[in-house]
A protein has these predicted regions:
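Single conserved hydrophobic/aromatic residue that forms the stacking wall/gate
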Residues: 1-10
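General structural signal for secondary-structure boundaries
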Residues: 11-13, 183-184
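A glycine-rich, hydrophobic loop/mini-helix early in the fold
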Residues: 14-23
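Glycine-rich ThDP/TPP pyrophosphate-binding loop and its adjacent helix/strand module
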Residues: 23-204
Length: 204
């Protein structure tokens, strides 16, 4: 009963995408969302905050790990690389930076807007251990997290090659869906697509 109730709560929350005051209003707000340690919105700040949290863990001799997710368009921000340089210098092996590498940002293809490639080599230059994976493959994601846990003396960057809008037929590889909600008809199609994708995952 608990599991069913929880699933219903999650589903109810999903329909509040972009509604002001909801969990999914847009950018996460630490005052309203349990488990969120930092309000965000401005591009480039997440990695810096994560580096600070990881450094605090080292200074306080705490045994925790910090995971941060950033976009491949977002790493065009210089602040990301300042943070990466410091993290590598301090050998923050409790830090994992995951780059969502779908090659699309709000303005189009990232390699045409301002190419950050090769992403893995750039992180390696700042003393990161890098892992390149298929970011739509859960087995590869799990394996990368395990590898990151075993890595000592340097932070880890996981370059997750993904498909934007994966699983929703009309959203896949479409930059236009970067920040808008579907209409009622599109919502119904998307839910059917995702239910099929979910069933396929459960059969693996």
């Amino acid at each position: 009963a608990y599991r069913r109730q929880r699933q219903m709560c999650i589903r109810d929350s999903l329909v509040t995408l972009r509604h002001t005051g909801s969990y999914l209003q847009g950018h996460p707000d630490m005052k309203h969302i349990p488990g969120v340690d930092m309000s965000s919105g401005s591009l480039g700040q997440g990695v810096s905050a994560a580096v600070g949290m990881a450094a605090a863990g080292k200074f306080d001799h705490k045994d925790y790990r910090v995971y941060t997710l950033t976009g491949d368009g977002e790493i065009q921000e210089g602040q990301i690389w300042e943070a990466a340089m410091w993290a590598g210098h301090r050998k923050l092996d409790n830090l994992v930076v995951i780059v969502d590498n779908n090659n699309l940002q709000i303005d189009g293809e990232i390699d045409k807007v301002c190419s950050p490639y090769p992403i893995d080599k750039k992180f390696e230059a700042f003393n990161f251990h890098t892992i390149v994976i298929d970011g739509n493959d859960f087995d590869q994601i799990r394996a990368a997290f395990e590898e990151a846990k075993k890595t000592k003396g340097q932070p880890t960057a996981i370059i997750a090659k993904t498909i934007k809008g994966k699983g929703v037929s009309f959203m896949e590889n479409e930059a236009g869906w970067h920040g808008k909600a579907p209409n009622d008809e599109q919502y119904e199609i998307a839910m059917k697509d995702l239910e099929k994708a979910g069933e396929a995952l459960c059969q693996k």
